[in-house]
Amino acid sequence: FKNNSSFNSNISFWDTSNVVSMDQIFAFSNFNQNISSWDVSKVENFNRAFAYNTAFNQPIGDWDISSATNLSGMFRGSNEQNKTIFNQDISGWDTSNVLIASEMFAYATFNRDIGNWDTSSIRLFTAMFTYNPSFNQDIGGWDLSSMTESNNLINGSNYGSPGNRMNGMFRNASSFNQNISGWCVTDITSEPEFFAINSSLTEANKPVWGSCP
């Protein structure tokens, strides 16, 4: 349904139990129907599934995403004037196998508690909350242990040093000022480019680069 601005029918009854990829399924569309009953337990790729969709705001917090490895740009908006409005409770998602979360909430208005997410496998956080003016939740307990030099390959692609994988994470995230000073960032010796530029994040609340408190 990518680029289909008119489709908004009830498809809640679809059998999605064998689907492995929902890459851009509702991107650039106005789809906004309840699909909370979908079985997405085998879906590995949610890349930009709802990206650039400024209508979707349905409860999908009960989805079983335990097979997911790619959440890149899942709720990404287009720009500052066209942000996505998705703001449902997804705190219960099983993110233990996710490798990529880049741009997941970029240009979005998402502001829900995701502090208990298992981020221990995530290797790419680039621009995750960039230009999100709303997000200000406690994620100080996130496990960044996969952000190491030895994990530079993600799905066969080389994303370079760990520092590059956090570039612009909170860029222009104007509300964010949670304490993330406890993040273990041993392999990131200096602040990543544009990490929190134009955000509300104070120096005291930033990670202590090159350390593991």
Q: Where do the PLM segments sit?
A:
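Negatively charged
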Residues: 1-213
